[in-house]
Swiss-Prot record:
Enzyme Commission (EC) number: 4.1.2.4
Top-level taxon: Archaea
Listed name of the protein: Deoxyribose-phosphate aldolase
PANTHER family associated with the record: DEOXYRIBOSE-PHOSPHATE ALDOLASE (PTHR10889:SF1)
Length: 224
């Protein structure tokens, strides 16, 4: 896979809390220029991103995060945020699981949290962020299987806000355990070589704020 070919697998991401409208507009322009898969932002920017991409007749998708970055919001709050994101034009929803529910064995509430977001998302594809850095291998597999059971399209490894991001071994683990769910690797992927390794391990999407560096052969500086 060539550098430019990998662009179509990249969610071009800006999730810093200090991001300005000018920053988001630049992100959108870059996504259009390089042909990235999506523009991924906080929900407050969803309508702006939708309007920009539509105005430029771009096939780039609008991706909005829900319950980001900690996933500890009430399920009702996640439902409302998802509803708003879809109403404002999101094509994809990246939701953060409730890690505490999973680690506590509160599996009914854990599943309900995911299922609620998937249901409200309608035709928007849901990527379930399982924050692998906090989980055992058994919990990673359980989270991936639950995401699939609830109708999610993807499992996503990380928010980029935890102590570590994507790991090749986690992608391989999920791919082997749940072969019929797509995987988004995110967190710390800054070079073409890293992105290629994750796609070879089984990732179908790469979440990064270093998309331009990846496709141009440079090295990104962001932690996400």
């Amino acid at each position: 896979m060539e550098n430019r070919d990998i662009a179509r697998l990249i969610d071009h991401t800006l999730l810093r809390p200090d991001a300005t409208q000018e920053d988001i507009e630049k992100l959108c322009a870059e996504a259009v220029e390089y042909g990235f898969a999506s523009v991924c932002t906080a929900t407050c920017w969803t309508s702006f991103v939708r309007e920009y991409l539509d105005a430029h007749n771009s096939p780039v998708k609008v991706c909005s995060v829900v319950g980001f970055p900690f996933g500890s919001a009430l399920t009702d709050a996640k439902r409302e945020e998802t509803w708003d994101a879809v109403e404002y034009g999101a094509d994809e929803i990246d939701m953060v699981i409730n890690v505490g529910y999973l680690r506590s064995g509160m599996l009914d509430l854990f599943e309900k949290d995911i299922r609620t977001v998937v249901k409200v998302s309608g035709s928007a594809a849901v990527k379930v962020i399982i924050e692998t850095c906090y989980l055992t291998d058994e919990q990673k597999v359980l989270a991936a299987r639950t995401a699939k059971k609830c109708g999610a399209a993807f499992v996503k490894t990380s928010t980029g806000y935890g102590p570590s991001g994507a790991r090749l071994e986690d992608v391989r683990l999920i791919r082997e355990a749940v072969p019929d769910i797509l995987i988004k690797a995110s967190g710390g992927i800054r070079t073409y070589e890293q992105a290629k390794a994750f796609t070879e391990a089984g990732a179908s999407r790469i979440g990064t704020s270093s998309g331009i560096a990846i496709v141009t052969g440079a090295r990104g500086e962001s932690s996400y």
